[in-house]
């Protein structure tokens, strides 16, 4: 599963 943009924002 490739990380979705939403998940990327959650990391920040």
Swiss-Prot record:
Pfam families: Tachykinin (PF02202). The keyword Secreted applies. One of its GO terms (biological process) is defense response. GO terms for cellular component: extracellular region. Keywords: Amidation, Amphibian defense peptide, Neuropeptide, Secreted. The modification Methionine amide is found at residue 12. Disulfide bonds: none annotated. Expressed by the skin glands. It is found in: Secreted. Tachykinins are active peptides which excite neurons, evoke behavioral responses, are potent vasodilators and secretagogues, and contract (directly or indirectly) many smooth muscles. Belongs to the tachykinin family. This is Hylambates kassinin. It comes from Phlyctimantis maculatus (Red-legged running frog).
């Amino acid at each position: 599963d490739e990380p979705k943009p939403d998940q990327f924002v959650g990391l920040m």
